Amino acid sequence: LVPLGTQTLVLMMQREAAWRLTSEERSKDRTPLGITLQRMGTLRKVRSVSPGAFRPIPRVDSTILEIRIQRHRSLGQDPSWRALVRGSFAQRRKTLLNNWTGGWGLSREEACERLAPLGLPFTARPEELTLDQWALLAERFDWKRRGGPLPEEGPA
């Protein structure tokens, strides 16, 4: 996701894309990429750029976005993390419970067991989770293996 040694990215993008990447929990605009980037560092909207700054003039507003990578550099390549966020957002209007039972074939009981430590109701949607709650889910389960628990570590 980020080239080795890169600490800061400065990108210009359509305003709506910047909103989705920087949206906070409980926002319907939240996306898997935005959550991943927020776990990796800080995102800051530097400034808006009006359509008049370009030739030909586009029909969209732009935003300059600064991304400072401070932690979890390889998060975007982690297959378990990618499976977790993609599977959780598989069908936007569905709850986490319904996405997990449909996408991974977990039983309703198994899906409820994964939600319980977060203290969330079973009606929770993926955009409602905090970054800490996403981290907890990622640490507890190997999501690329149909949401199963992480394998026990054997003797070294």
What are these language model-derived features?
Residues 1-126, 136-156:
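Class I S-adenosyl-L-methionine
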